[in-house]
């Protein structure tokens, strides 16, 4: 019997890097809502009292970026002096956006291999490799460690926003270690939560007292509710439980650490449980295959698992800039399928159109911000892009294709 512990982490919406992801995707949403053909590559930097948005944009949309950025920061919770020193009302906002390079645009506008089919005219926005993954460890077909870490992070933000734990501040991280036996999760080994908080809670200001108070509150209001519906639950007797191990966490957010778009790519995907091609998602329009093809790869992998063709599936896609058809498609089932990897790959080639134009069209990736009131990509910029049962994401809905594959 093999036995090991696997660990994944998540971060809250107030983490400096996640602020940047949300700002970049809010910019993307705003531009696509007005002009669905917008080309966007928006990067964000935050530091003490400063937010910079930069990158390349080609669009007919007109957006007040200053107001947009401040609104995102305020919604996260950085909107007063008590929010840890970073304030949407007083921070400097610098905008440095340029146009997309015409050399890149020409390959995306008219693919090198098009031959009559309109979907062949959309070339990949860059070269690269993308991975998608699914497994049967959770109802949403995600690995359990990252699923639990996201649950805790979302709940941490929820009890802050609704006032249940009003002393919490926006910055925070979660980490979950799961025990596996023969590749099946059997126990929760460790839960770690680091959360920013005010300096004094109900008269308690010493480090030991703060940790004890926060630890007890988080178990009651975060850990237990976040795991209540799971068959595998943490136990006070057997699960190691760590809260703010350094003692206190008062200075946080951009006041404590600089943040950048695209620095939480493992949090965004599978928590390290599957491979990653290296490309970030946020701030990129759908012609960037770093984003759209990663969504498609997840769709394929999830469909294979949902159809019962494998218990685990990892899909690798690769693209060349300006070329519509994938350079390669590979499926790995890790010995959990009655079919060979070659057979599964052939099945994918026969049933999925993985050209960028087809991915964009099938998932309506250019139109979703407009259809959802100007707020779509920002929703997935925190707490993961996959396995989101709280959001209606087209790449997560595999019911139709899974039924077809079963037949």
Swiss-Prot record:
Q: Where is this region: Flexible loop?
A: 100-110
Q: Name the predominant localization.
A: cytoplasm
* Assembly description: Homotetramer; dimer of dimers.
Q: In which pathway does it act?
A: Amino-acid biosynthesis; S-adenosyl-L-methionine biosynthesis; S-adenosyl-L-methionine from L-methionine: step 1/1
Superkingdom per UniProt? Bacteria
**Residues annotated as binding ATP:** 15, 171-173, 248-249, 257, 263-264, 280, 284
State where Mg(2+) binds: 17
Please report the name of this protein according to its UniProt entry: S-adenosylmethionine synthase
| Record-linked InterPro entries | ADOMET_SYNTHASE_CS, S-AdoMet_synt_C, S-AdoMet_synt_central, S-AdoMet_synt_N, S-AdoMet_synthetase, S-AdoMet_synthetase_sfam
User: Where does it live in the cell?
Assistant: Cytoplasm
Q: What is its EC number?
A: 2.5.1.6
State its role: Catalyzes the formation of S-adenosylmethionine (AdoMet) from methionine and ATP. The overall synthetic reaction is composed of two sequential steps, AdoMet formation and the subsequent tripolyphosphate hydrolysis which occurs prior to release of AdoMet from the enzyme.
Cofactor annotation comment? Binds 2 divalent ions per subunit. Binds 1 potassium ion per subunit.
- Organism of derivation: Synechococcus sp. (strain RCC307)
The family classification in the record reads: Belongs to the AdoMet synthase family.
Reaction(s) catalysed by this chain, per the record, are:
L-methionine + ATP + H2O = S-adenosyl-L-methionine + phosphate + diphosphate
Which keywords belong to this entry?
Answer: ATP-binding, Cytoplasm, Magnesium, Metal-binding, Nucleotide-binding, One-carbon metabolism, Potassium, Transferase
What molecular functions are annotated in GO for this chain?
A: ATP binding; magnesium ion binding; methionine adenosyltransferase activity
Residues binding K(+) are: 43
Q: Which cofactor does it need?
A: Mg(2+); K(+)
A GO BP term here is: S-adenosylmethionine biosynthetic process
Q: Which GO terms describe its cellular component?
A: cytoplasm
Enumerate the Pfam families for this protein: S-AdoMet_synt_C (PF02773), S-AdoMet_synt_M (PF02772), S-AdoMet_synt_N (PF00438)
> Which residues does L-methionine bind?
56, 100, 257, 288
């Amino acid at each position: 019997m093999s036995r090991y512990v696997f660990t994944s982490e998540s971060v809250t919406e107030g983490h400096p890097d996640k602020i940047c992801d949300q700002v970049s995707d809010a910019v993307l949403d705003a531009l696509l809502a007005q002009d669905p053909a917008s080309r966007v590559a928006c990067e964000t930097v935050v530091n003490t009292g400063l937010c910079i948005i930069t990158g390349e944009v080609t669009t007919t949309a007109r957006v007040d970026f200053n107001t947009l950025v401040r609104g995102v920061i305020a919604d996260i919770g950085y909107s007063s002096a008590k929010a840890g020193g970073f304030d949407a009302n007083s921070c400097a906002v610098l905008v440095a956006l340029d146009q997309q390079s015409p050399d890149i645009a020409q390959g995306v506008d008219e693919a090198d291999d098009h031959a009559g089919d309109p979907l062949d005219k959309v070339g990949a926005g860059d070269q690269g490799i993308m991975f998608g993954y699914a497994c049967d460890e959770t109802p949403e077909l995600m690995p359990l460690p990252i699923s639990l870490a996201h649950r805790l992070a979302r709940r941490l933000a929820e009890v802050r926003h609704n006032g249940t734990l009003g002393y919490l501040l926006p910055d925070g991280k979660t980490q979950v270690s799961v025990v596996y036996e023969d590749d099946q999760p059997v126990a929760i080994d460790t839960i770690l939560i680091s959360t920013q908080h005010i300096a004094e809670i109900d008269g308690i200001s010493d480090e030991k007292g703060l940790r004890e108070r926060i630890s007890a509150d988080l178990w009651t209001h975060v850990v237990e509710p976040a795991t209540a519906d799971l068959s595998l639950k943490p136990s006070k007797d057997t699960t190691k439980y760590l809260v703010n191990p350094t003692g206190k966490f008062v200075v946080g957010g951009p006041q404590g650490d600089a943040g950048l778009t695209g620095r939480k790519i493992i949090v965004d995907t599978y928590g390290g449980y599957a491979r990653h091609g290296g490309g970030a998602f946020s701030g990129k329009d759908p012609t960037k295959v770093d984003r759209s093809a990663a969504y498609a790869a997840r769709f394929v992998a999830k469909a294979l698992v949902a159809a019962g063709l494998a218990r685990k599936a990892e899909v690798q896609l690769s693209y060349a800039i300006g070329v519509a058809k994938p350079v390669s498609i590979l499926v790995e089932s890790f010995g959990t399928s009655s079919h060979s990897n070659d057979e599964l790959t052939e099945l994918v080639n026969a049933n999925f159109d993985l050209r960028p134009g087809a991915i964009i069209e099938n998932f309506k990736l250019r139109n979703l911000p407009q259809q959802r009131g100007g707020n779509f990509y920002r929703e997935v910029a925190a707490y993961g892009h996959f396995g989101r049962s709280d959001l209606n994401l087209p790449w997560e809905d595999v019911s139709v294709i899974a039924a077809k594959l079963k037949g």
